[in-house]
Amino acid sequence: MACGQRGGSWRPSGWFNAGWSTYRSISLFFALVTSVNSIDVFQLVNPAFPGTVICDERGITVEFPSSPGTKKWHASVVDPLGLNVPNCTYILNPEKFTLRVTYENCTRRVHGGYQMTIRVMNDSAALRHGAVMYQFFCPAMQVEETQGLSASTICKKDFMSFSLPRVFSGLADDNKVTKLKMGWSIEVGDGARVKTLTLPEAMKEGFSLLIDNHRMIFHVPFNATGVTHYVQGNSHLYMVSLKLTFISPGQKVIFSSQAICAPDPVNCNATHMTLTIPEFPGKLKSVSFENQNIDVSQLHDNGIDLEATNGTKLHFSKTLLKTKLSEKCLLHQFYLASLRLTFLLQSETVSMVIYPECVCESPVSIVTGELCTQDGFMDFEVYSYQTQPALDLDTLRVGNSSCQPVFKAQSQGLVRFHIPLNGCGTRYKFEDDKVIYENEIHALWTDLPPSKISRDSEFRMTVKCSYSRNDMLLNINVESLTPPVASVKLGPFTLILQSYPDNSYQQPYGENEYPLVRFLRQPIYMEVRVINRDDPNIKLVLDDCWATSTMDPDSFPQWNIVVDGCAYELDNYQTTFHPVGSSVTHPDHYQRFDMKAFAFVSEAHVLSSLVYFHCSALICNRLSPDSPLCSVTCPVSSRHRRATEATEAEKMTVSLPGPILLLSDDSSFRGVGSSDLKASGSSGENSRSETGEEVGSRDVMDTKGHRTAGDVGSKAVAAVAALAGVVATLGFICYLYKKRTVSNH
């Protein structure tokens, strides 16, 4: 038996909008167990609600406990003061012991969700007591309601992700007892294929869960457990059903979601962009882009053609697409900023978001081995009629150079080029057993005036030729050529030595930030690099790096950091070299390493805390190393070290822009700001109290290069500690005196 009850005209502010988003991909329900706040207006008998509250997108269901003694009871929706809520419609089912209400008119909108209060009257003889009021909270069920987050599946290259609203607190609770009762579990798949995993097990399977203040982001890799893969030709679609359960004391949260993703690139021709989706159980409902939501029945009228045989194909007219400049495209690249596809899947609405763009390469590419001549040139011809509209041959340019064609016949619409492989901006690269040379030709269309030269109005043509390794041996006598002198001798090369905050080497310290402050054993990240050169054939090789107590790199004492391109073997904390990745244009132009901050010690005396760093380096020919240091292998033997010694004319020396202030681990400056530390360091005051090798001290080199004992001893430690104690005592006495003086007045 079910009865409906309706009130008068009370309607609180800020109510939930009943028009749920048609692009929902996440369905959630939230079960609160035995932890609902209760307020007994007349008699506080049962402070915790013994039943279950289920929150879903349509409303709230309250399930009361059923027992043989519960025969007569009544429940109603009231406001926080216990008064009946007018205009509230709810369904009370005494047989199933349930109360069902809608969010509209029966709840109060609060931050993050909805609040509802009910009053329960139990008139049974066994459980006779007065009315008890219970207050419930239901979270906002859709991500769109909170912080403007997207509820659709976001397709990436190797995984799909979707956002869930963060509808509870306590994930980071430090209470150990609470943590033992909390935990995640994940159900993957549906039907008989459901697999339940704990969160650590799911992480091992490749899943990941990211949580911030407003949302939870769940990542599902395409090869994870439970992901269904649909394939049709070269098109792929991935689908997964998930149920995430979070259990905490008195509370159970369940998120249910179906996610789909079609990550394949689109195909483009002269007029359309085509998106292909394999056949799967879902049925397309609508397409959304550029703030337009187009129903499937209206696609053709909006420039989109649909093929629904053997999967789904959507043909977008290029008039609907945006354009952007691209290095790989002739003029522009066509794309959509985002495209949302909404499907009806197993009676649920599921959406995915993709970012389609037309893939394009250089439109004209001449690739043939015959273009490369045996004497090291590339020969090719360009005709004006190669394109429509025709090319203006007078505007032809070769790369970024001023090289001109060797022959031009305007009547025939022909120009002929004879380009040296080592000039005119020609580039080369190695692939397997071939060396490939490449250049690019620029030209304007004949219907554009010469003043309109710009990247988006240019025609570009790539010309390539290659030599095989055997061809190089047969046709070119490489051994007879002397190596380029400028690659190892003094020339227009400039080096720079810089320090970085960490091993990401993103942004170096500026000159105005010196002196830098470091504590003992704290790493100092260094980088030596070549500047103002883009020659890919040169390679920077470190010779030596050392530290001094003055800015003069030739001053003594010195301490070695790098010797003959290798870490100093006698160092307690050896230098670590870092590889240079492909994020920079010429990785061979860089050398990166770090060393641990140390105390400067000489003859049992602590030297100045300001330390200056210097490096010497060589520039080598990468293709033909002409110095033993250019191909050094660490560690270096003493015999090889003598053989690899470079002349002073070959080496270049660089220094850091400023010194580094070194402090001991227990220095009283640890809590002081960086600017105060720099001021202290630049004044020459030494605040270290530990200089033994076990805390980061290092021996220095005398003028003959011999090691000097590096133990400061207990006297230096005691002196510094005593001085610090005296200063602290005097400061405390002054403080007491001032305080007493103020109180007397």
Swiss-Prot record:
Residues 641-745 form a propeptide. It is found in: Cell membrane. Residues 39-716 are extracellular. The chain crosses the membrane at residues 717-736. Residues 737-745 are cytoplasmic. Disulfide bonds join 55-138, 88-106, 372-465, 403-424, 545-615, 566-634, 620-630. It comes from the Eukaryota. Residues 687-709 have a biased composition (Basic and acidic residues). One of its GO terms (biological process) is prevention of polyspermy. Glycans are attached at residues 105, 122, 310, 462. Residues 1-38 form the signal peptide. Expressed in oocytes (at protein level). Keywords: Cell membrane, Cleavage on pair of basic residues, Disulfide bond, Extracellular matrix, Fertilization, Glycoprotein, Membrane, Receptor, Secreted, Signal, Transmembrane, Transmembrane helix. Residues 469-491, 673-709 are annotated as: Disordered. The record marks 172-173, 640-641 as: Cleavage. It is a single-pass type I membrane protein. One of its GO terms (molecular function) is structural constituent of egg coat. InterPro entries: Zona_Pellucida_Domain_gp (IPR051148), ZP-C (IPR055355), ZP-C_dom (IPR042235), ZP-N (IPR055356), ZP_chr (IPR048290), ZP_dom (IPR001507), ZP_dom_CS (IPR017977). PROSITE patterns: ZP_1, ZP_2. Proteolytically cleaved before the transmembrane segment to yield the secreted ectodomain incorporated in the zona pellucida. Proteolytically cleaved in the N-terminal part by the metalloendopeptidase ASTL exocytosed from cortical granules after fertilization, yielding a N-terminal peptide of about 30 kDa which remains covalently attached to the C-terminal peptide via disulfide bond(s). This cleavage may play an important role in the post-fertilization block to polyspermy. Additional proteolytically cleavage of the N-terminal peptide of 30 kDa occurs in one-cell and two-cell embryos. GO terms for cellular component: collagen-containing extracellular matrix; egg coat; endoplasmic reticulum; extracellular region; multivesicular body; plasma membrane. The ZP domain is involved in the polymerization of the ZP proteins to form the zona pellucida. Can form homopolymers that assemble into long fibers (in vitro). Polymers of ZP2 and ZP3 organized into long filaments cross-linked by ZP1 homodimers. Interacts with ZP3. Component of the zona pellucida, an extracellular matrix surrounding oocytes which mediates sperm binding, induction of the acrosome reaction and prevents post-fertilization polyspermy. The zona pellucida is composed of 3 to 4 glycoproteins, ZP1, ZP2, ZP3, and ZP4. ZP2 may act as a secondary sperm receptor. This is Zona pellucida sperm-binding protein 2. The gene is ZP2.
